Amino acid sequence: MGLPALPDAAIELHASASDWRAAVELAGACLSRSGAAEAGYADEMIRMIDEHGPYVVIAPGLALAHARPGPEVLRDGLAVVTLATPVDFGHPHNDPVQVVLALAVHSPEHHLGMVAELANRFNDSDAVERLAEATTADQARAILGVAA
């Protein structure tokens, strides 16, 4: 299956966010800028977290925001936002979060597989820290193993 490309428009490094909602909105804006999703997809990701809690915080310092495939998803897309100051999502063990990934998947059949594939990129224990410290889009892509 493979992960979607990560264009420059889908990357925002050392951004500022007042809280987790603002961080997810930034990630959604990156997906929108890159043409992968409509602006409303950020609202869907936030709604999922409101409904199900901070399940998106999958590792210390890392959130993988996503929502179900729907009309807001234009094509498969990936976004990366690193935060200058980490924010809390309310996770009992993995807060605060400094790296927010956003994933938009067009096909319901590929949704869970793509979430799992992206999560597996962080089996390397220092990957979150390296991504948080990335200063260029190319560094972020290299850490994730994705193309532009």
Per-region residue spans from a language model:
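Cytosolic covalent-transfer regions centered on His/Cys nucleophiles
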Residues: M1-A148
